[in-house]
A protein has these predicted regions:
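C-terminal alpha-helical cap/extension of soluble enzyme domains
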Residues: 2-3, 9, 14-20, 38-45, ...
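A general structural signal for well-ordered alpha-helical segments in protein cores
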Residues: 32, 70, 95, 182, ...
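Catalytic alpha/beta core domains of metabolic enzymes, predominantly
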Residues: 134-137, 148-248, 252-258
């Protein structure tokens, strides 16, 4: 048993701001700063995820643009909450370079996607452990592994345990929403002190009850998630259940027909934060779904 090294206010939520783009496809830094201010004030996050999940659309940027986005977001955070910086890349060398860059900017930790083989198909457990070992051993910051089947690999609990047993890997962001799997994962990883486990919106309430460290929440749902976490910490499970009922509907009611990023940007606009449209050619929420 080891003690995880994320010195954050847990249980709590990690919030990844969406990336606002202007009409020319450039990052709208002013809009980004307004969104970060909203996240800090309304979501009271344990950390802000910086260019670390696919819904942040960082993958459309070139390497210089990605680094500029990281720097602009950390500057907008201004030390108010910890920054968790994404370093996912097919090249382990580039991931290490991004980790070093994040450390120079004052980040708290880095996040790395569990990948498929860049050439196609699933990687073996041995390959994934080697990939994470090469990066985590060279990273100046502690690392959160990111399990997101689809954009990344789908791996089972034995492989996750091997990855999380590596030195300097202190957390797991888990996106499967499979509650049966999550129950065993929390028991074998969080409860055993191997690493902190962060789930996601639809399963936040039940997994908090099981003892997870929190969740990764999209910006427009993060204020509700903060209320849910605070209710659980206070022992007010009836209040937490009310917040959970809201999560059960949003974004599930709209995301299937429109996609996650369009729903998140439309939701932020409804909150008074215009973060633009998804990066082209992928479209916005259909007019029929905009109230």
């Amino acid at each position: 048993v080891r003690e995880p090294k994320l010195l954050w206010n847990l249980p709590g939520n990690i919030v990844p701001p969406v990336t606002p783009f202007d009409a020319n496809g450039k990052v709208d830094v002013a809009a980004l700063r307004r969104e970060v201010d909203y996240v800090v004030a309304a979501a009271r996050p344990a950390a802000i995820c910086v260019a670390g999940v696919e819904a942040q659309e960082y993958q459309y940027l070139d390497e210089a643009g990605r680094r500029d986005l990281i720097a602009a977001t950390i500057d907008a955070i201004g030390g108010r909450v910890p920054a968790l910086v994404g370093i996912s890349h097919a090249s382990y060398r580039e991931s290490i370079a991004l980790a070093e860059y994040a450390a120079k900017l004052g980040a708290s930790a880095v996040q790395l996607l569990i990948p498929n083989r860049p050439s196609g198909g699933p990687a073996t457990t041995a390959e994934l452990v080697k990939y994470f070992g090469m990066i985590s051993s060279a990273s100046p910051l502690p690392m959160v592994a990111y399990h997101n089947p689809g954009p990344g690999a789908e791996v089972g609990l034995p492989a996750l345990r091997e990855i999380l047993a590596l030195d300097n890997i202190v957390g797991l962001k888990e996106s499967s929403r499979n509650q049966r799997f999550l129950g065993t994962l929390i028991a074998d990883v969080e409860d055993q002190g191997l690493a902190h486990v962060f789930t996601t919106m639809e399963v936040l309430f039940p997994t908090l009850i099981l003892g997870c460290a929190g969740g990764t929440m999209p910006a427009p749902g993060a204020a509700i998630s903060a209320l849910l976490v605070e209710a659980v910490r206070a022992g007010d499970l009836a209040r937490a259940a009310q917040m959970h009922a809201l999560h059960a509907e949003m974004p599930a009611r709209w995301v299937g027909a429109n996609g996650l990023v369009p729903v998140m940007k439309a939701s932020l606009r409804a909150l008074g934060l215009d973060c633009g449209e998804p990066y082209p050619p992928f479209g916005a929420v259909s007019a029929a779904h905009v109230a």
